[in-house]
């Protein structure tokens, strides 16, 4: 059993969710409630959080200092200067904390938003993880902006 634990940890690290498929007999009214929850309530709560994080991210990127740090980081990465890379990375991380573009702020914001929508905490945390993945794409990869979910999108 102990030898399978590292494999399980690696699997959990690589996959963001576990899906369990069950067959159930559900009444039409319960089906309507489930669809309403997934399409409307979860989407609007996620869009509220996306709006908060988008505002903070846009304010961060708008600063000259952060854009300058991004260019320095790119130059240091190309030249493979690890010391400079760490210093610039630490300064960028500190600015992200100042402008509240962190996973912890995203999670705490979703907790506040969840008080309005009364979602199950697992659903709320899942929405926060989805939004944070978008923020990470903008911060650390080639993402340009955060996008809201439209009605009917999955």
Explain the meaning of each model-derived region:
Residues 1-154:
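Nucleic-acid substrate recognition interfaces
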């Amino acid at each position: 059993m102990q030898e399978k634990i590292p494999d399980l940890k690696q699997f959990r690290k690589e996959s963001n969710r576990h899906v369990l498929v069950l067959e159930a007999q559900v009444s039409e009214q319960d089906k309507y409630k489930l669809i309403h929850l997934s399409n409307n309530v979860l989407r609007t709560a996620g869009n509220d959080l996306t709006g908060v994080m988008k505002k903070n991210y846009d304010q961060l990127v708008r600063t000259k200092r952060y854009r300058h740090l991004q260019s320095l980081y790119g130059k240091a990465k190309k030249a493979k200067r690890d010391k400079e890379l760490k210093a610039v990375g630490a300064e960028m991380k500190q600015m992200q904390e100042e402008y509240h573009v962190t996973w912890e702020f995203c999670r705490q914001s979703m907790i506040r938003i969840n008080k309005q929508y009364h979602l199950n905490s697992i659903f709320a945390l899942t929405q926060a993880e989805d939004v944070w993945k978008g923020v990470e794409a903008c911060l650390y990869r080639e993402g340009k902006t955060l996008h809201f979910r439209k009605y009917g999108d999955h």
